[in-house]
Amino acid sequence: MFCSRSLFASTAISLTMMANAAYADLTAAQVWGDWKSYMEGMGYTVTATEAANGDTLAVSGVSVEIDGGPDIEKMRIGMGAVELVGNSNGTVDVVMPDVMPIIVEIDPKSTDKPAKFELAYTQSGQKMTVSGDPAAMAYDYEADTFSLALTSVLVDGTVM
């Protein structure tokens, strides 16, 4: 489970990065491209459905997959949809649902059983704004509350 803890930590860090705002022109596509590059740079394969409408980029069906190392064949993480909204001041707002489902699937290499974890990333009063320039993005994140709850565990198809 070491790989999954590392993945959760890297995902949480990327979702909640704090920095001072620096204003320059960014687009929603540049922010999404930065997220994809970051994850791909860590060895993940990233897939998603992208739909642009004006200054808004809706990203849904987000899935990241990685070879898991010596004990895990593959690990896949699926996440809910986000919208990246370009603002007139050159910043981009990241709009997430109040509850974002996260599904982690692990296929072992050994005789261990496959596992599936379902989580709910819940937040209220969330606001995330990305500023800066494409080479140096800064994230300003705030939320009244947020939590990550384990909602189900299946091992070899059996609810635990």
Give, region by region, the residue ranges found by the protein language model.
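Glycine-rich, small/hydroxylated-residue low-complexity segments
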Residues: D25-M160
